[in-house]
Each structure stands twice: as structure tokens, then as C-alpha cells.
């Protein structure tokens, strides 16, 4: 494997991880199970969606 191929693979892997980190919490109205999944820190226990702050 060439150096360019290795750098390309590392760049693609890094880009995929950036998207995961940016989407680490769910926005208001998203489906959730636990409160720590929501950006607001509040998950409705009855309807299983993220509540606003």
C-alpha cells in the first residue's frame, strides 16, 4: 500500500469520526431512550423523544 493510499484511508476515517462527534446528541423531537442522548438533557419517558430545554 502506498503512502498516498494510507493517507487517503486515514482522512476518510477521520472525516467519518467528525460526523459522529458532531452528532453526539439528539436535537429536540428526536427519538431517545435515555436523557443523556438529548442535547437538552431531557428525554420524555412516556413518548421517547427529546424535550426542549
UniProtKB/Swiss-Prot annotation:
Coiled coil: none annotated. It is found in: Secreted. It comes from the Viruses. InterPro entries: Toxin_18 (IPR012623). One of its GO terms (cellular component) is extracellular region. Residues 1-18 form the signal peptide. Disulfide bonds join 25-39, 32-43, 38-50. The keyword Secreted applies. Keywords: Disulfide bond, Knottin, Secreted, Signal. Pfam families: Toxin_18. The presence of a 'disulfide through disulfide knot' structurally defines this protein as a knottin. This is Conotoxin-like peptide 1. It comes from Orgyia pseudotsugata multicapsid polyhedrosis virus. The gene is CTL-1.
